[in-house]
Amino acid sequence: MGLPKGFSSQRKRLSAVLNMLSLSLSTASLLSNYWFVGTQKVPKPLCGKGLPAKCFDVPVPLDGGGTNASSPEVVHYSWETGDDRFTFHAFRSGMWLSCAEIMEEPGERCRSFLELTPPTEREILWLSLGAQFAYIGLELISFILLLTDLLFTGNPGCSLKLSAFAAISSVLSGLLGMVGHMMYSQVFQATANLGPEDWRPHAWNYGWAFYTAWVSFTCCMASAVTTFNTYTRLVLEFKCRHSKSFRGAPGCQPHHHQCFLQQLACTAHPGGPVTSYPQFHCQPIRSISEGVDFYSELHDKELQQGSSQEPETKAAGSSVEEC
């Protein structure tokens, strides 16, 4: 039941790719002004030259006499009623700015979303921004840990530690991102109902940045699950291998590393202290990663001892042949 090394590295690469994708999407959505899009209902200006309003003029004399007066006052009447008296301008809003079309000239007018937010909702907006920054920061930390595990780690114990910390960072960042998205949605809905009269949207919907943020959250949680799965498989493989090593001594299972050292002491130096492994004597293992470090180093020591004993064995064999 060993875990193939290539399979483990593939899962680590998948976690790193998902984390990088989540980091890119979350950064793009944070900087975008397309969280919400819609239209604003703006009254048309009064009748005048160059304006598209449907108006007609009725001259009214100033002295109240007939229509042939020398200086009549002109009264403007419009045929438009209902929604025809308004224009609908497109607008877009994000965490930083809210921009809308203007009637006088082509272009947009942008205002700070913080200024549009009601005073009672500004604290929630600041919390939302803080959660978004923490979300991106933890994602960046998780990506660095996964990249370090892929490129520079050959020690299985260190790999376990990096995988565990990367998974925890991904989970925390995903939770903070979810909270930040929900808080900003609540702030926008309150601003749409209680904001300035000249800004309140007539109709609005979610923009591409909103969906991008939730896709980023999904990728972040998928990366966390994949990293946790890799960590669990490594731990199970470690336990399986070393349970086979101590299957012959069932009474020593609670403290199998100490019993293993005692067996080495008895087999290597009967009746004497252990001289080959002085640094491992009576050291309890407090975690899985320490156990992996312990057995990895112990295995290296055994290989070194075996390689040093081979020349002695060959020399002894040659001396016997000469005799």
Curated annotation (Swiss-Prot):
Keyword terms: Endoplasmic reticulum, Membrane, Transmembrane, Transmembrane helix
GO cellular component: endoplasmic reticulum membrane; plasma membrane
Membrane-related topology note: Multi-pass membrane protein
Subcellular location: Endoplasmic reticulum membrane
Keyword Metal-binding among record annotations: no
Location of the region described as Disordered in the Swiss-Prot/TrEMBL record: 302-323
Major subcellular site: endoplasmic reticulum
Membrane-spanning intervals of the chain: 17-37, 133-153, 164-184, 208-228
Keyword flag Transcription: no
Function description: May cause the redistribution of PAPOLB from the cytosol to the endoplasmic reticulum.
Record text on subunit structure and interactions: Interacts with PAPOLB.
Family: Belongs to the GSG1 family.
The protein's name in its UniProt record: Germ cell-specific gene 1 protein
Species the sequence originates in: Bos taurus
